[in-house]
A protein has these predicted regions:
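Membrane-embedded beta-strand positions of outer-membrane beta-barrel proteins
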Residues: 84-88, 146-148, 179-185, 204, ...
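Repeated loop/turn-to-beta-strand initiation elements of outer-membrane beta-barrel proteins
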Residues: 137-145, 174-183, 210-220, 245-253, ...
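Residues on the lipid-exposed face of transmembrane beta-strands in outer-membrane beta-barrel proteins
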Residues: 88-90, 126-136, 150-152, 167-173, ...
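Detector for outer-membrane/organellar transmembrane beta-barrel domains
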Residues: 199-296
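Transmembrane beta-strands of outer-membrane beta-barrel pores
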Residues: 88-94, 136, 150-156, 185-191, ...
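Outer-membrane beta-barrel initiation region
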Residues: 26-168
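Residues that define the transmembrane beta-barrel architecture of outer-membrane proteins
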Residues: 122-128, 159-165, 196-202, 231-237, ...
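Outer-membrane beta-barrel "beta-signal"
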Residues: 321, 325, 336-352
């Protein structure tokens, strides 16, 4: 990394030949991590003469990641930063109250009808969220990220609300030669009219950023996670592979494999993929996921679920992004089958 930085600083002295935001356009894709974007940017401008604005931008991005020298510019970056924000919420929920399916529960020759007041309610919810995020840089390539988030969304149709809260902290550590070891902890709670669910995760992940071929930049990761639900705990293995392609398309693949948990419906494996490309100079995101959970038992009957999800999001105009998709769950117990459209409007947050 030091070699790249030195060559870049020498090249940046000659500003007569400008490359208009080359690094920004090619490397800082929406969704890409800062580390893979920085690696890409440094490689893109090796031996090239770039405009001062681009140099300042990359210098700032490097210093944000704890690379204290950056590109050698004198512009300081505070070791400790915090930000507060608020944002509106407008989305569709297929289960606003945490209720049950209106269909009868059929187990063999037995059939059970639920109480109508406990049926799930669906519809549009609107509300407000607020967050506090911070970063503390405590060493070369080492920093802590932390955040708190709370939100409330209400359904005017049903007179019901969904309250959520979450907290997270991450220790990010660049070891050497673009090897990283990170530790993450998070917890979240979702309160509805009928249900109140809490879960937490504690993980350690190692990753490597590299260039598998010319103008292709990747980050491979491997880690372990301990998942804490209210009724069980589970060990999980994590795999990830992210790439900025030569045509500036960004892709990400993640795989989670979980241990079997006796008499509990728990993740067996989950696979997700994301593709980000530019459409009319705006990021078009395509996302898909598949998960399989097994081990569940209900009155002596085994339960396993398969869930498919696909969505697309695109900025409609400044400060507003629309996301639409479809999710379906196929269960060995038909009562838990579900198919539903999904949509959400994501608004830019107001920082204060």
């Amino acid at each position: 990394m030091l070699k790249k930085t030195f060559q870049l600083k020498v090249a940046a002295l000659g500003l007569s030949f400008l490359l208009p935001s080359l690094a920004s356009a090619a490397c800082y894709d929406d969704g890409a991590s800062a580390r893979i974007s920085n690696y890409c940017a440094l490689d893109k401008i090796q031996g090239a003469r770039v405009d001062l604005r681009t140099v300042q931008f990359i210098d700032y991005k490097l210093k944000q990641e704890g690379m204290q020298r950056g590109l050698g510019l004198s512009t300081p970056v505070a070791a400790s930063t915090t930000s507060k924000s608020a944002y509106p919420i407008l989305s569709y929920s297929d289960n606003i109250n945490g209720g049950n399916s209106p269909e009868p529960l059929v187990l063999g020759n037995l059939s059970f009808d639920g109480e109508k007041e406990l049926y799930r309610r669906e519809g549009v919810v609107a509300g407000l969220g607020a967050s506090l995020n911070g970063r503390y840089i405590h060493g070369e390539g080492r920093y802590l990220n932390y955040g708190l988030n709370a939100s409330y969304a209400h359904s005017p149709k049903h007179g019901l609300g969904i309250a959520t809260g979450s907290a997270n902290v991450s220790s990010i550590n660049h070891i050497r030669n673009w090897w990283f070891v990170d530790a993450h902890a998070n917890t979240s709670r979702v309160r509805k009219d009928i249900t109140d669910d809490t879960n937490s995760n504690l993980s350690i992940v190692t990753s490597k950023v590299f260039e598998p071929s010319d103008n292709i930049y990747s980050e491979a990761s491997f880690g372990v996670n301990r998942y804490f639900a209210e009724s069980y705990n589970q060990n999980q293995v994590l795999f990830g592979y992210k790439t900025i392609h030569a045509n500036s398309v960004y892709s990400a693949f993640n795989l989670t494999v979980g241990d079997a948990v006796e008499n509990q419906l728990a993740t067996k494996f989950a696979l997700s993929a994301q593709l980000v490309t530019q459409l009319m100079n705006k990021p078009l995101k395509l996302s898909a996921s598949y998960s399989q959970a097994d081990g569940g038992m209900l009155l002596g009957f085994e339960r396993s679920d398969e869930t498919y999800n696909i969505s697309v999001s695109y900025p409609l105009w400044r400060g507003l992004t629309a996301s639409v998709g479809y999710r379906t769950t196929d269960s060995t117990i038909d009562y838990f089958d579900m198919s539903t459209p999904t949509f959400e409007f994501q608004f830019s947050s107001y920082n204060f």
